[in-house]
Amino acid sequence: MAAGSRTSLLLAFGLLCLPWLQEGSAFPTIPLSRLFDNAMLRAHRLYQLAYDTYQEFEEAYILKEQKYSFLQNPQTSLCFSESIPTPSNRVKTQQKSNLELLRISLLLIQSWLEPVQLLRSVFANSLVYGASDSNVYRHLKDLEEGIQTLMWRLEDGSPRTGQIFNQSYSKFDTKSHNDDALLKNYGLLYCFRKDMDKVETFLRIVQCRSVEGSCGF
């Protein structure tokens, strides 16, 4: 084959393949509905782990008298994450914008990255499926990333690193009036369950507002 013919053939082949190459090199945009589905799955998994571990621990170690005393005492039942401003009822929650609810959810998730590792022994002795400090920490980090992605998509698309929760649990723990390790772990599990319930609720509201046909799930 002549050199000129070979060059023409290669050029024609390249032109035919160009649209496919361009399409393959482009990064497809993940649908917003899928991003919310992924975030909700992670949030629900975290809440279920928190709820099941809390129930298991309470039934195994906490007497009814201890439970009532714990819940009625504002010093023992105070959660360190309550320093994060969150809406206190349904009406106030509905008044928050989507981005506000996502930011609150992000701060709640970030607030648990340190203290959840203090529950290592509790998770290690738990019979709840998937309950280990490494699994829970990974779920928290995955959801943190998922919420940051949702904030990026719902805002203006500009890159953002997300606000980092600054108050450390260790500072709160030094002020704790609970010297009993058993009750201290119970208090952490109580707060963890409470906060993961908030996160799942806030994400569900934002999903309902943002994705058609997603309400009621």
From Swiss-Prot:
Tissue expression: Expressed in the placenta.
GO-annotated molecular function: growth factor activity; growth hormone receptor binding; hormone activity
Residue numbers bearing the Phosphoserine modification: 132, 176
GO term, biological process aspect, one: response to nutrient levels
Disulfide linkage: 79-191, 208-215
A Pfam family reported for this protein in Swiss-Prot or TrEMBL: Hormone_1
Residues of this chain annotated as glycosylated in UniProt: 166
Keyword set, alphabetical order: Disulfide bond, Glycoprotein, Hormone, Phosphoprotein, Secreted, Signal
UniProt GO cellular component terms: extracellular space
Subcellular locations according to the entry: Secreted
SUPFAM superfamilies: 4-helical cytokines (SSF47266)
Coarse class of the protein's main subcellular location: secreted
Residues of the signal peptide: 1-26
Known function: Plays an important role in growth control. Its major role in stimulating body growth is to stimulate the liver and other tissues to secrete IGF1. It stimulates both the differentiation and proliferation of myoblasts. It also stimulates amino acid uptake and protein synthesis in muscle and other tissues.
Protein family according to the UniProt entry: Belongs to the somatotropin/prolactin family.
Protein name from the UniProt record: Growth hormone variant
